[in-house]
From Swiss-Prot:
Keywords: Cytoplasm, Endoplasmic reticulum, Nucleus, Repeat, Ubl conjugation pathway, WD repeat. Part of an SCF (SKP1-CUL1-F-box protein) E3 ubiquitin-protein ligase complex. Interacts with KAT7 and SKP1. One of its GO terms (cellular component) is endoplasmic reticulum. Its main location: cytoplasm. Substrate-recognition component of an SCF (SKP1-CUL1-F-box protein)-type E3 ubiquitin ligase complex. Promotes KAT7 ubiquitination and subsequent degradation in collaboration with MAP2K1 kinase, leading to reduced histone H3K14 acetylation and increased cell proliferation. It is found in: Cytoplasm, Cytosol; Endoplasmic reticulum; Nucleus. This is F-box/WD repeat-containing protein 15. Gene3D superfamilies: 1.20.1280.50, YVTN repeat-like/Quinoprotein amine dehydrogenase (2.130.10.10). It comes from Mus musculus.
Length: 466
């Protein structure tokens, strides 16, 4: 017998379901199908998974409903999971194009139902030029004129297909990677140390940290200076933004400097905030930071302390509280655990959206919950793990042989599933190492450096079409 409920209570019940359960509910009868296919429900799921989902996103993707957008985007994300090693083509960029110092994806998306879109990587080389490389065709698609000063920092904003560079003279340039000349230019008086370009709810911005401990916020696309704030007594090591860019953590790896988490809007809305709003996380000698994917307010830090040394993992929830006209930020420690370095010495880590910490030692890949319960171990001896790349979908383990293992986070469990291994086609140089690894939906890149500081960029391009 079919169950009949008024629309509002039924919609309330359906709003608690995940996508898989909504699809099942839609099969009950015609009325349930109509409610379970509601744009309100599917837009909520899209916003939870991909954050900035609005009507512009829907029009850009050419979809009629949020349900169709969700299903197609999931299909796109899982292209690498469905693939096998034989479905990838190994490519290497010619060394005649120059020696590479940086490589960042500038393409916004990969696969579509209609076929295979381009993966495009933006690079800086030793000739002080910026260029873009079509990963699938292995060709240079754009190149800037040679710059008057060496470029020391590069970042990209794939959503807008732009790149931002900073040279040794602290000149900032914004590029659309189509025109030969930069779209906008600005300068700082002090040397730059860190660079980030992000989308916020107030619009796209560039964040730059200098050696004096200042953070400078510039507007995109004209590089107008929005604000400059001194946040630390020394230059900070990195700029770590939360998934929706509500928060930004700034810190320096120093025993007497504690990490600070700032409310991003307090940097951007200078007329509304007389000073930045922040909180201090009371742990020193942090080594790495990772914001929990698809959760705006949770961050995990790995630090070291004591003798014999231990590695600490601490997870905080960051909250904004209002008292009248005053707003304050609080960081609440919700979980922690430690590992003895003489037994397990993690070097790198990441976090899944289900609060699972994955970390790598030289010889193993380990999974813990945020309280320290070990969930799984993947052994790598006699190989050595040299890089670990973690995002909401993938975990990529890179070994000293140049081979890489691709894992996928399970949708309905806490564990990882190993998908396949990709091999490099030529041996690494005797003293070569993998400087950087990154991926998008349809490709994986590696920046390899040898003993002479010569670099090459290799890629694995997925050649599966719909």
């Amino acid at each position: 017998m079919a169950i009949h409920l008024p629309c509002l209570p039924m919609m309330k019940i359906l709003s608690y379901l995940d996508a898989y359960s909504l699809l099942q509910a839609a099969q009950v009868n015609k009325d349930w199908n109509e409610l379970a296919s509601s744009d309100v429900l599917w837009r909520k799921l899209c916003q939870k998974r991909w954050l900035y989902c609005d009507m512009d996103t829907l029009q850009l993707q050419g979809k009629e409903t949020w349900k169709q957008f969700f299903i197609d985007r999931i299909w796109q994300e899982r292209a690498k999971f469905r693939a096998k090693a034989k479905d990838f083509t190994y490519k290497e960029i010619p060394l005649m194009c120059g020696l590479f110092g940086y490589a960042c994806y500038i393409s916004g998306c990969g696969l579509t139902r209609k076929g295979q879109d381009k993966s495009v990587v933006c690079m800086v080389n030793s000739k002080n030029t910026i260029s873009t490389w079509d990963v699938h065709k292995s060709v240079i698609t754009w190149k800037s004129p040679e710059q008057p000063a060496s470029i020391k920092l590069l970042t990209t904003l794939p959503e807008m297909h732009i790149a931002v560079t900073v040279d040794i003279q602290s000149t900032i340039k914004l590029w659309d990677c189509h025109n030969r000349e930069a779209l906008a230019t600005n300068n700082l008086k002090s040397p730059c140390k860190s660079l980030k370009a992000v989308f916020t709810k107030d619009g796209p911005i560039v964040l730059i940290g200098d050696t004096l401990g200042n953070i400078h916020i510039f507007r995109i696309p004209d590089l107008y200076l929005i604000s400059t704030v001194n946040v630390l007594p020394y230059g900070f090591d990195g700029i770590y933004c939360s998934p929706q860019k509500k928060w930004v953590l700034l810190s320096k790896k120093h025993p007497h400097i504690l990490p600070k988490v700032f409310y991003m809007s307090s940097f951007l809305r200078t007329s509304e905030f007389s000073a930045p709003v922040s909180t201090v996380l009371k742990l020193s000698l942090y080594e790495r930071v990772f914001w929990t994917p698809r959760r705006e307010d949770r961050i995990t830090l790995m630090s070291r302390s004591g003798f014999p040394q231990v590695k600490m993992f601490e997870t905080y929830d960051i909250k904004l509280e209002e008292f009248g006209n005053k707003r304050i930020v609080k960081g609440k420690l919700i979980a922690s655990f430690e590992l003895q370095c003489h037994k397990v010495n993690p070097q790198r880590f990441g976090v899944s959206d289900k609060n699972v910490i994955v970390c790598s030692t030289e010889s193993s890949l380990l999974l813990f919950d945020i309280n320290g319960l070990r969930l799984k171990t993947f052994q790598y001896c006699p190989e050595m793990i040299v890089k670990l790349s973690v995002d909401p979908l993938h975990v990529i383990v890179i070994c000293n042989t140049g081979s890489m293992d691709v894992y996928a986070w399970e949708e309905r469990s806490l564990l990882l599933r190993k998908c396949y291994r990709l091999h490099i086609e030529r041996p690494l140089p005797l003293y070569g190492f993998i400087y950087k690894a990154a991926c998008d939906d349809v490709s994986i890149i590696q920046l390899i450096t040898d003993e002479l500081s010569l670099s090459s960029l290799t890629s694995y391009a997925l050649n599966i079409c719909s």
